[in-house]
Amino acid sequence: MADMGRHGMAMAMAPAAAGGAGRRKRYMHMTFYWGKNSEILFTGWPGASGGMYALALAAVFALAVLLEFLGSPRVQESSSLGSRRRRATAAAVHAVRVGLAYLLMLALMSFNVGVLLAAVAGHAAGFLAFRAGLCGGGYKKGELAPAACC
């Protein structure tokens, strides 16, 4: 607690276990930052490569679009309550959707502004395509969309 006056934007990770003397020092950001040198979901990924960072942003964008598709009326109506098989399918789709939502949340916990913008853009594009009716199957007039909550 002697270093309370330090106002750095990163916090050093816990020291490596025995035998890890040759490891590089990693930082866990505690505030939003802009830069391609980040770790999203996995240690060392995407690394310092600009191309891998762009791929990571594209993956986050696609994941957000997929989440909007899985929550769209088209998917919800196709697995509406009926037979046991349809209810089981609806439960499986819901489980996949929640799992992917948590994965997206973990990606956002990298505190990288690019990841945040990719996720918001993906949700907006997915909403426009699947929920607002651009690709058909949107909500009818006067019908409210369910809250986008985990």
Curated annotation (Swiss-Prot):
InterPro entries: Cop_transporter
Keywords, comma-separated and alphabetical: Copper, Copper transport, Ion transport, Membrane, Transmembrane, Transmembrane helix, Transport
Topological category with respect to the lipid bilayer: Multi-pass membrane protein
Listed GO MF terms: copper ion transmembrane transporter activity
TM region positions: 50-70, 100-120
Assigned GO CC terms: plasma membrane
Subcellular location: Membrane
Principal location: membrane
Top-level taxonomic group: Eukaryota
Keyword Membrane: yes
Function description: Involved in the transport of copper.
Family indicated by similarity: Belongs to the copper transporter (Ctr) (TC 1.A.56) family. SLC31A subfamily.
Protein name per the record: Copper transporter 3
Lineage, opening ranks: Eukaryota, Viridiplantae, Streptophyta, Embryophyta, Tracheophyta
